Every structure is written in structure tokens, then in C-alpha cells.
Swiss-Prot record:
Outcome reported for the amino acid change (mutating residue 249 to L): In PCTT; results in reduced protein secretion and loss of activity
Disease: Pancreatitis, hereditary: A disease characterized by pancreas inflammation, permanent destruction of the pancreatic parenchyma, maldigestion, and severe abdominal pain attacks.
Family statement: Belongs to the peptidase S1 family. Elastase subfamily.
One GO term (biological process): intracellular calcium ion homeostasis
Pfam families xref list: Trypsin (PF00089)
EC number: 3.4.21.2
Residue ranges annotated as propeptide in the record: 17-29
Glycan attachment residues as annotated in the record: 25, 52, 226
Record protein name field: Chymotrypsin-C
């Protein structure tokens, strides 16, 4: 009975996922870009850690249920205390209307996470409490298991990462168009070569628009034909030469390769 109840809850969540009350402006960019429309990506969260009595943004993440957040494994440290900010647009405004801060109950890092090779770069955070969904706080859809997107499929990366290489962290949420790069192209020797595996997805690489430091863990948002948005990727790594290096697209953990793992951890 418990399993049926959990499944019913997940299905109910899925039926109302990925539809923001405030549709995004789809012409903006991240590095070298513009601010996102406030609350147009209401599943975007800020993962924050405590240092010297101050909460600091470290990574992005995606709300996929009222008490679960997807992020990257490389964002997690066993020595840090975390909280999750939901419903945020401007990180400089502590008491921003429609936002709240939630403690962390449990963090599941993929047991095969490899920090050297950056493989299985995925973590699931269980929040200390359920958050009430609203116009500013909503959940993203999960992609269908093992699904792939075609070359040049238009997706958007979002986050509060650096505005340019070695630049300042953004106060307001940023967004940027990141067309999908097919695996055959991204794994070419003059692109990412053998470092890119089929459990990853590449997007961008035009040398102009890109994710950057601080965007890690955040979503690659891709819109379905029915208008809803799914988190198809999790920001994993980019080029050391800079945040918007040509032929070095941002590499994302491909969420559709981990659906079974996500479902397993959500039912613990």
C-alpha cells in the first residue's frame, strides 16, 4: 500500500510539472547574457552552505518533487552544512517575496561518482520538509527513461554562476540558450573526445553563450511539445580555458540515464 501511495504521489506531481506561472523570455543568455524573467524557472534552487555564520551560494539544483532536489555530486562535501533556497530570483534579497529556505534531511550521492573522471555526477537531496508549491515554487518534469534529444534541440541553462570567466557571481537568475550537441560531435577529438560518455549530454559550444562557475548542479531545461519543461541535464563540467570556449560545450549529466536511480532513492 505504501508503494502505491508513493507512486500515486509521484504521478500526481508529474501531471502538474514543468509549467511556470510566468513563462520565460526565451531570447536571453547566461555568460555574456541577460537576467531571466523573475520566477520563470520556478524549479531552480540555490544550494547554499554555511561559512563564518554566513550562507553562501555554491551550486544550482532542480526541484523535482515537493521535498526532493537534483544536483551534481561534485557540489556536495561531507564537511559542509547545507540549506536550499527555493522560489528565488535575486540572491541578494534575503526576504524575497515568494521564496523560502529549507533545511536538508538526507543527501544521496551516486555510489559510482568518480571525481577524477567526472562520471555519475549526480546527487539527490531530500529536504527536511515538503515545500508548498506556488507561482514562485514549482517542480520540473523528469525526462522519460533513456530518452535522447536530437542535435540542435533548443534547451536553456539557468543559474547564478559567474557572469563571465573569473567574473562576479550573478545576483539575479540568468538563463541562456544551449542547443544540444549530439554525442558523435561532442566526442570528437577536437571537442571533448573520450571524456564524454553516453550518460552525459553536451549543449552549447558556440563560444558565446555558456554556463559558468556557480551554475554547477543546475538544470538544462528542455521544453516538450506539450509546453512543459523537463530537466534533461545537470551542469557537470566545462573547459578550464574559459566558460564560453568554442568546441568545448558544457557537459551535463544526462538525467534520462538515471531515472531508475532517482526513483529508487526517492522511495527510501
Amino acid at each position: 500500500m505504501l508503494g502505491i501511495t508513493v507512486l500515486a504521489a509521484l504521478l500526481a506531481c508529474a501531471s502538474s510539472c514543468g509549467v511556470p506561472s510566468f513563462p520565460p523570455n526565451l531570447s536571453a543568455r547566461v555568460v555574456g547574457g541577460e537576467d531571466a524573467r523573475p520566477h520563470s524557472w520556478p524549479w531552480q534552487i540555490s544550494l547554499q552552505y554555511l561559512k563564518n555564520d554566513t550562507w553562501r551560494h555554491t551550486c544550482g539544483g532542480t526541484l523535482i518533487a515537493s521535498n526532493f532536489v537534483l544536483t551534481a555530486a561534485h557540489c556536495i562535501s561531507n564537511t559542509r552544512t547545507y540549506r536550499v533556497a527555493v522560489g528565488k530570483n535575486n540572491l541578494e534579497v534575503e526576504d524575497e517575496e515568494g521564496s523560502l529556505f529549507v533545511g536538508v534531511d538526507t543527501i544521496h550521492v551516486h555510489k559510482r561518482w568518480n571525481a577524477l573522471l567526472l562520471r555519475n555526477d549526480i546527487a539527490l537531496i531530500k529536504l527536511a520538509e515538503h515545500v508548498e508549491l506556488s507561482d514562485t515554487i514549482q517542480v520540473a518534469c523528469l525526462p522519460e527513461k533513456d530518452s535522447l534529444l536530437p542535435k540542435d534541440y533548443p534547451c536553456y541553462v539557468t543559474g547564478w554562476g559567474r557572469l563571465w570567466t573569473n567574473g562576479p557571481i550573478a545576483d539575479k537568475l540568468q538563463q541562456g540558450l544551449q542547443p544540444v550537441v549530439d554525442h558523435a560531435t561532442c566526442s570528437r577529438i577536437d571537442w571533448w573526445g573520450f571524456r564524454v560518455k553516453k550518460t552525459m549530454v553536451c549543449a552549447g559550444g558556440d563560444g558565446v553563450i555558456s554556463a559558468c562557475n556557480g551554475d554547477s548542479g543546475g538544470p538544462l531545461n528542455c521544453q516538450l511539445e506539450n509546453g512543459s519543461w523537463e530537466v534533461f541535464g545537470i551542469v557537470s563540467f566545462g573547459s578550464r580555458r574559459g566558460c564560453n570556449t568554442r568546441k568545448k560545450p558544457v557537459v551535463y549529466t544526462r538525467v534520462s540515464a538515471y531515472i531508475d536511480w532517482i526513483n529508487e532513492k526517492m522511495q527510501l
